[in-house]
């Protein structure tokens, strides 16, 4: 299983790679939070609570995107192979 870290810069490329990995987990960071949720349909997606709050997206971001703390993100990333598309 791999963790794909994505911002908006290389989002399309990152998603295409993640879709080839049936066990992929995605962590959206920075402006990646503005991506259309439909792009991640059927995928496990996380976002940092602090980044969601900073951008005022608490009410907008779908509940299918799991909110995590930075500490939880570190735990996820240390347990899996990390691929960055930032």
Where do the model's predicted regions map?
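Extreme N-terminal starter segment of soluble prokaryotic enzymes
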Residues: 1-3
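Flexible, charged surface loops at secondary-structure boundaries
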Residues: 18-22, 39-42, 74-79
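Short, hinge-like loop/turn segments at secondary-structure boundaries
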Residues: 42-45, 63-64
């Amino acid at each position: 299983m791999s963790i794909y870290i994505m911002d908006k810069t290389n989002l399309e490329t990152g998603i295409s790679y993640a879709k080839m990995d049936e066990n992929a987990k995605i962590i959206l960071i920075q402006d990646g939070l503005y991506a259309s949720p439909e792009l991640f349909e059927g995928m496990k997606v996380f976002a940092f609570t602090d980044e969601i709050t900073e951008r005022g997206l608490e009410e907008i971001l779908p509940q299918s995107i799991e909110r995590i703390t930075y500490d939880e993100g570190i735990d996820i990333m240390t347990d899996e192979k990390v691929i960055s598309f930032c």
